[in-house]
């Protein structure tokens, strides 16, 4: 299961700072969704070998009538769906009446809750902790989110608590050969995601259609996902339900139509993601945010432009030009123009899904990767940094889904972004990787003398003189 952690608290206590620390915002994509999840932030995070999802629920205020939660209905639902609550408070201001009201609200949820006392620098934390012991809703952890102090201890306690409560977790540590064989034998898990009313459920029904073998609810690793097994062209797949796959008669709550939390879970649990766009609406900023989340997760993906029927040639050409411009940064992705309603061009989607899955899980030898690296260097030498040319020595395979290439060399981590991008593109084209992101990691050998103190000059002369060694 991918645990969900919700950050809750009144405004200006440092929730966003903690969110950025947990998600490593410089690397991870943070999506700000408009409309359904306006002003809320969702992000992927990782601690040790465990992945989790973080939700910044925004500020909770208080009115004359008591607790007034100034967040939209879907954010409340996200809090209720969370596995763990981080109740963030301010060490400088201490316990406030708003904190007491929020604690009263959280106590009703009966979720594992951790009190996070932020901004502890220069504060007598013992006195502050005594104030918050009174609300008695969970363990207390003092942190400095801006500096990152105390966060590792906090996360260790969180995951220890989850394990002790027998909650299954998704662990990235594995035995390479065993997991790779299992991956090849398992059905391809296919998540269908997209904005509302783009035709996700119509596409799913078109997939199932005559080829549907059995439909049942298979309890998955994410609490609210429905898994629908199917077979197409003798290949097994599992469609991951993201609310749009349910029958319309069963959807009574607007939150079920598009839950960002469920979408994030579906992406994490899938092997390949189908991002569905509406040909009539083009690609929106929300579509691009969702695409960024998919890329950030490292999942293979295929883009499907639905409702392609009944469009003029001029309109189709215009849409293709717009997509080519706005999606130029993902020239490795397959794009299909279909009509889910009439089943037009559906079969080609599965060809691209299989290709993307194969590319994301393929194994590559160290010899081949090193050979490609040397060819890339020969065609375009690494730059000179601080008077020395970067020397890249060898490359090896670092993982799959997404494919990871680890390059070793002196000053490798100091390479400019432009050269790193060149190497990434070179490996992609050389290995013919389509439909999946590829990640390049750079390692350089540790300096064995970095922690050795130099010998004072006088002592050095004395030692050498005892050995009858002349110093020039």
Curated annotation (Swiss-Prot):
Q: Does the keyword GTP-binding apply?
A: yes
Q: Which InterPro entries match?
A: G_ENGA, GTP-bd, GTPase_Der, KH_dom-like, KH_dom-like_a/b, P-loop_NTPase, Small_GTP-bd
Task: Give the matching Gene3D superfamilies.
Answer: 3.30.300.20, P-loop containing nucleotide triphosphate hydrolases (3.40.50.300)
According to the entry, every stretch annotated as the KH-like domain falls at 362-446
GO process terms (BP): ribosome biogenesis
Tell me the residue numbers annotated for binding GTP 2.
194-201, 241-245, 306-309
TM helices/strands, residue ranges: none
Q: Show the GO MF annotations.
A: GTP binding; ribosome binding
Domain EngA-type G span(s) in chain numbering: 3-166, 188-361
Which residues hold GTP 1? 9-16, 56-60, 118-121
**What keywords tag this UniProt record?**
GTP-binding, Nucleotide-binding, Repeat, Ribosome biogenesis
NCBIfam families reported for this sequence: GTPase_EngA, small_GTP
Q: What does this protein do?
A: GTPase that plays an essential role in the late steps of ribosome biogenesis.
Q: What family does this chain come from, according to its entry? A: Belongs to the TRAFAC class TrmE-Era-EngA-EngB-Septin-like GTPase superfamily. EngA (Der) GTPase family.
Q: How does it assemble?
A: Associates with the 50S ribosomal subunit.
HAMAP family (alphabetical): GTPase_Der (MF_00195)
**Which protein are we looking at?**
GTPase Der
Question: What organism, scientifically named, is this protein from?
Answer: Baumannia cicadellinicola subsp. Homalodisca coagulata
Per the UniProt record, the lineage of the source organism begins with: Bacteria, Pseudomonadati, Pseudomonadota, Gammaproteobacteria, Candidatus Palibaumannia
